[in-house]
């Protein structure tokens, strides 16, 4: 069984039934209400010890297994504090939940190494995050903490390690009239459940996605891997336009820049190398996060896709 078989679970829609772990907590309550207001098909939540009650007019369950059996949910979003978040992810894997979106920042790295070890040895569950804004199919389903109102149904697939820079790309693609087909925040931690390649594979196969924005940052080699994947799978006359921005061009080596994974270590993970790798794969790299929308618009113009 191959973990990559679960990539298809990233494609959420208005038919996706969602539950929330950490449902009755402060974050869970706030963001669940936002999701309901957006129109997400949220069908219940989990709060151990509070099973049988209702919250926000929805049923509360003691376990993910119980919630999945009772509601038929195919996705769960996790707003559980860092010390208990890995256990929450594991519980969702046990229940074979097709999509798990973990928002929590600050999960101990050792916990995530163990989760990841388990994750890649199964094919039922796809994890997005941790330390990410989530996944949204505009106008249909919002799983996570992204502001719904800036999104607009459209043609661009967006994948990013940064939350706020995702919102920048979203707002700009909405403003130039291209909109978004699917936006995935893969998170800023070094050990996460979904990488650039997973998302690029979904975008390249999706007929609704006509262009791609990839937002990376210093640290690790995910961008270099993504560049190699694009070179292999997105070249020739039918290639989809890809625009990218890499944060941290001026970052000093050895200093962690906001995200746990955003660090230049052992002389590797700098922005220059990442930019060069992407350009070599035919990606148009924008030097400013403020020009992502205009850059992809120009690429669409060039290819007469407008």
Curated annotation (Swiss-Prot):
It catalyses: succinate + ATP + CoA = succinyl-CoA + ADP + phosphate; GTP + succinate + CoA = succinyl-CoA + GDP + phosphate. One of its GO terms (molecular function) is succinate-CoA ligase (GDP-forming) activity. Substrate binds at residue 167. CoA binds at residues 24-27, 50, 103-105. It is found in: Mitochondrion. InterPro entries: Cit_synth/succinyl-CoA_lig_AS (IPR017440), Citrt_syn/SCS-alpha_CS (IPR033847), CoA-bd (IPR003781), CoA_lig_alpha (IPR005810), NAD(P)-bd_dom_sf (IPR036291), SUCC_ACL_C (IPR005811), Succinyl-CoA_synth-like (IPR016102). Pfam families: CoA_binding, Ligase_CoA. Its EC number is 6.2.1.4, 6.2.1.5. Succinyl-CoA synthetase functions in the citric acid cycle (TCA), coupling the hydrolysis of succinyl-CoA to the synthesis of either ATP or GTP and thus represents the only step of substrate-level phosphorylation in the TCA. The alpha subunit of the enzyme binds the substrates coenzyme A and phosphate, while succinate binding and specificity for either ATP or GTP is provided by different beta subunits. This is Succinate--CoA ligase [ADP/GDP-forming] subunit alpha, mitochondrial. It comes from Columba livia (Rock dove).
